[in-house]
Amino acid sequence: MESQRNILLIGLLFVSFLLWQQWQADQAPQPVAAAQTQSSIPASTVADSHSSDVPDADSAVPEAITASKELITVFTDQLEIKIDPVGGDIVYSALLSHKLEENGDDPFVLLEQTNDIYYIAQSGLIGRDGIDSSVKGRAHFDSASREYKLADGQDTLSVPLTYVSDKGVTYTKSFVFTRGKYNIAVDYKINNTSDASLQVQMYGQIKHSIKKSESSMMMPTYLGGAFSTDDIRYEKYSFDDMADKNLDDSTLGGWVAMLQHYFVSAWVPPATEKNIIFSSMKNGLANIGFRGELHDIAPGSEQVIKSEFYVGPKDQKALSVLSPSLNLVVDYGFLWWLAVPIYKLLMFFHSIVGNWGFAIILITLTVRGLLYPLTKAQYTSMAKMRNLQPKLAELKERFGDDRQKMGQAMMELYKKEKVNPMGGCLPILLQMPIFIALYWVLLESVELRHAPFMLWITDLSVQDPYYVLPILMGISMFVMQKMQPMAPTMDPMQVKMMQWMPVIFTVFFLWFPAGLVLYWLVGNLVAITQQKIIYAGLEKKGLK
């Protein structure tokens, strides 16, 4: 009977998890209409030390403009980038090592401007002597070439854009790319050859047209903003949050990002400077960005203002190098403390076997091995409970409907026979958090995107295209159920639920990532093997 109760407990916990997950999605506000506008960020968002001549954020940070016909194209080993010489904005990015479709040739495009989506990374100089303004327009930069390419044997590539103001001040905006990396150093060098001091302030922001995340009950994903300050290590700030309230946070360092499934774009200003983290929503565009410190540049002097922009996969190692908290955009949910070691163990096994499917199998064997002492105690407790059934039936006949006396007598019997009636539940309770944590690891880790296993399983991060694994998983549950006969004391409703449980689980798992179904299937097969071994030992001790 304990086995049946355990399976029912699995079902209850599993369904509860799915319902809780769907409730979270349902409670989230729907995206606002594209035409909705918000008031500008007030001038108070500028740090107190700033001059009153600095315009407010909405006028200082220019609106998006149509890209120039002649874009500057940059090729590295990882990126294809297009830069608009008007303003020097990054208006297109293709990730050459990540394909749009499995086994396809086209790269995954993150930043782009099309009829369906507007997603760019904008940066500029504002302030009294800034060269970017929604009133005066953007700086028109000159470039020595319309195409740059990282050559073989070359580790870095610099793309300089120059602009000379009517005062004779030279502004050089440089994009520095590094082999093997997705982060771009975006620097401004201001050579003040005028006879007056200059005041400029760098900003960087990410603009994204409002659209709904392509999410489902079994594959929930997030599309929206996120930020970090010295008080808040990581917080999502959705399009709806931006519509409700503009961000206005002062911080030392920090970062802002736009997230989607597996990929991220982020501005990371200098960690030693005081920055303003802001957001706004206007004309159907969600904006999240930063404004740096106000820089005074004396006549005849030169100054460099630095920042970093990342556009690529949610690679935890690469992100943590840019900022200690940027890797948190790989969001494993409330069980992150369990998911992180699972991810690291999965990476370790993959480094050995070179296949993510076999790495998942090794994770399963490890978990089942660690839980084996508890599993053995579980089956031992179940065997003792079965042997107690005649005595329990006798107590039920003796006390009839007196539940209080019946309960007391049962507890005394359990104590006398050294049986824990809940002993069979602990392994199940421990497995569920591991299952949920692995679920988020498979869902969030870009390493699993388009990761093949064998035969027909060519992508472990999505559902089995032929539903073979879920069906095998259902069969394994049915076998486990048959190995443990129904207790005669079970009521008809429990019997019906038990009979339908493998079918219900199979239906649920049809849309789960194949890697997760593989984990559960292998876990069931190991459990069947362990059950046979443990029962053989119990029979020798007279327990059946």
Curated annotation (Swiss-Prot):
Subcellular location: Cell inner membrane
Keywords, comma-separated and alphabetical: Cell inner membrane, Cell membrane, Chaperone, Membrane, Protein transport, Transmembrane, Transmembrane helix, Transport
Gene Ontology, cellular component aspect: plasma membrane
Keyword set includes Magnesium: no
InterPro entries: Membr_insert_YidC, Membr_insert_YidC_N, YidC/ALB3/OXA1/COX18, YidC/Oxa/ALB_C, YidC_ALB_C, YidC_periplasmic_sf
Pfam families for this protein: 60KD_IMP, YidC_periplas
Matching CDD domains: 5TM_YidC_Alb3, EcYidC-like_peri
Transmembrane segments: 6-26, 345-365, 423-443, 460-480, 503-523
Residue numbers spanned by region Disordered: 34-58
Coiled coil start-end: none
Ranges of biased composition (kind: Polar residues): 39-49
Function, as annotated: Required for the insertion and/or proper folding and/or complex formation of integral membrane proteins into the membrane. Involved in integration of membrane proteins that insert both dependently and independently of the Sec translocase complex, as well as at least some lipoproteins. Aids folding of multispanning membrane proteins.
Family, similarity comment: Belongs to the OXA1/ALB3/YidC family. Type 1 subfamily.
NCBIfam families membership: PRK01318.1-1 (NF002351), PRK01318.1-3 (NF002352), yidC_nterm (TIGR03593), yidC_oxa1_cterm (TIGR03592)
HAMAP family according to UniProt: YidC_type1 (MF_01810)
UniProt protein name: Membrane protein insertase YidC
Organism: Shewanella halifaxensis (strain HAW-EB4)
Phylogenetic placement of the source organism: Bacteria, Pseudomonadati, Pseudomonadota, Gammaproteobacteria, Alteromonadales
Gene: yidC
